[in-house]
Amino acid sequence: GFGCYRSCWKAGHDEETCKKECS
């Protein structure tokens, strides 16, 4: 979900990583 993506991004990960992690 979006919350996961936002947390991932704020933690300093890149877009592709967050898409995978939060899919």
Curated annotation (Swiss-Prot):
Changing residue 20 to R: reported impact?
A: Does not block any channel subtype tested
GO cellular component term, pick one:
extracellular region
Post-translational changes noted in the entry = Is not amidated.
User: Beyond the main fields, what else does the record say?
Assistant: Negative results: has no effect on Kv1.1/KCNA1, Kv1.2/KCNA2 and Kv1.3/KCNA3 potassium channels, suggesting that the presence of an additional charged residue in a position adjacent to the dyad lysine impedes the functional block of Kv1 channels produced by this toxin.
Q: What is known of its domains?
A: Has the structural arrangement of two alpha-helices stabilized by disulfide bonds (CSalpha/alpha 2(S-S)).
- Role summary: Shows very weak blocking activity on voltage-gated potassium channels Kv10.1/KCNH1/EAG1 (6.2% inhibition by 40 uM of the toxin). Has no effect on the other voltage-gated potassium channels tested.
The protein's name in its UniProt record? Potassium channel toxin kappa-KTx 1.3
**Organism, scientific name:** Heterometrus spinifer
